[in-house]
């Protein structure tokens, strides 16, 4: 939790000429007594392509700071024209209002600044050498970008957690032994599983073949027994046996006629069971 909280910033002289001072009314709240002062700074970004043109316009130490809500006026000089490339004077740039405690920055407020001439003619056809006296600035005070940082204040308890955290055990194992170890274990486990599956398929196939062979042998033996029992030696039959069979056939035909008469007198009974059809 921050001991100092920024409540608001008002840009007082806006819009203004490029060479005029910057003025800010800053309001902040202090939650506990601080041992050191707050350092406020205003930085002008001279170029979007390189930070070598950045200028610290002014800095201010504020303190001792009482607990509660505090307000003050921060003034800063205009940037030095000689340190800004001519091509970077006109157009949009940025100013940064920052505050630090004991050399540790905890708040940063960024504003876009539009620099242009005060007449439409000069804006339509700007001269090669900028006319600084005719340039005006407009700070987009309604759209600041605020960034907060966690810092250590007076007590050790207020210090933020270190990032990344210390991991001394991570240095005990060489990177070559650490990286790829899990992948190697997974590949070995997959290979073992595939090998076990292939062995299981092979063993089950052998059992099926053996069972089929035994079954075929049993069927063949049964067929042999049936052929032996049902075989008839036609040549071994005697003429007497044949005559007896012919007489028996005659009697059977007579009996058959009687059976046909009996069956005609009795109606045939159906043995079919009703079948329900599921729709």
Curated annotation (Swiss-Prot):
GO MF annotation terms: histone binding
A cellular-component GO term for this protein: nucleus
GO terms classed as biological process: DNA replication-dependent chromatin assembly; nucleosome assembly; nucleosome disassembly
Biased composition (Polar residues): 268-279
Superkingdom as given in the UniProt entry: Eukaryota
Biased amino acid composition, Acidic residues: 179-194, 219-262
Residues covered by region (Disordered): 179-279
Key words of the record: Chaperone, Chromatin regulator, Nucleus, Transcription, Transcription regulation
Gene3D superfamilies in the cross-refs: Histone chaperone ASF1-like
Location of the protein in the cell: Nucleus
InterPro entries, A to Z: ASF1-like, ASF1-like_sf, Hist_deposition_Asf1
Assembly and oligomerization: Interacts with histone H3 and histone H4.
PANTHER family according to UniProt: ANTI-SILENCING PROTEIN 1, HISTONE CHAPERONE ASF1
Protein family: Belongs to the ASF1 family.
Described function: Histone chaperone that facilitates histone deposition and histone exchange and removal during nucleosome assembly and disassembly.
Protein name: Histone chaperone ASF1
Organism this protein belongs to: Gibberella zeae (strain ATCC MYA-4620 / CBS 123657 / FGSC 9075 / NRRL 31084 / PH-1)
């Amino acid at each position: 939790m921050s001991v100092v909280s920024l409540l608001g910033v008002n840009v007082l002289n806006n819009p203004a000429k490029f060479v005029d001072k910057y003025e800010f009314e800053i309001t902040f709240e202090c939650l506990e007594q601080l041992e050191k002062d707050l350092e406020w700074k205003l930085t002008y970004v001279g170029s979007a392509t390189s930070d070598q043109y950045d200028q610290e316009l002014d800095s201010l130490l504020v303190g001792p700071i009482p607990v509660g809500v505090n307000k003050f006026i921060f003034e800063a000089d205009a940037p030095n024209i000689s340190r800004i490339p001519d091509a970077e004077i006109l157009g949009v740039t940025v100013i940064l209002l920052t505050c630090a405690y004991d050399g540790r920055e905890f708040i940063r407020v960024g504003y876009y600044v539009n620099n242009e001439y005060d007449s439409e003619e000069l804006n339509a056809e700007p001269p090669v050498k900028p006319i600084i006296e005719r340039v005006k600035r407009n700070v987009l005070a309604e759209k600041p970008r605020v960034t907060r940082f966690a810092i250590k204040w007076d007590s050790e308890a207020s210090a933020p957690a270190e990032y990344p955290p210390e991991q001394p055990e991570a240095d005990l194992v060489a990177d070559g032994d650490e990286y790829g170890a899990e992948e190697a274990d997974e590949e070995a486990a997959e290979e073992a599983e595939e090998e076990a599956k292939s062995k299981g398929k092979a063993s089950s196939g052998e059992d099926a073949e053996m069972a089929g062979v035994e079954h075929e042998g049993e069927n063949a033996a049964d067929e042999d027994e049936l052929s032996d029992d049902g075989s008839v030696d036609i040549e071994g039959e005697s003429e007497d046996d044949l005559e007896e069979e012919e007489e028996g056939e005659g009697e059977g035909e007579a009996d058959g006629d009687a059976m046909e008469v009996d069956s005609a007198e009795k109606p045939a009974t159906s043995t079919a069971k009703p079948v329900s059809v599921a729709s």
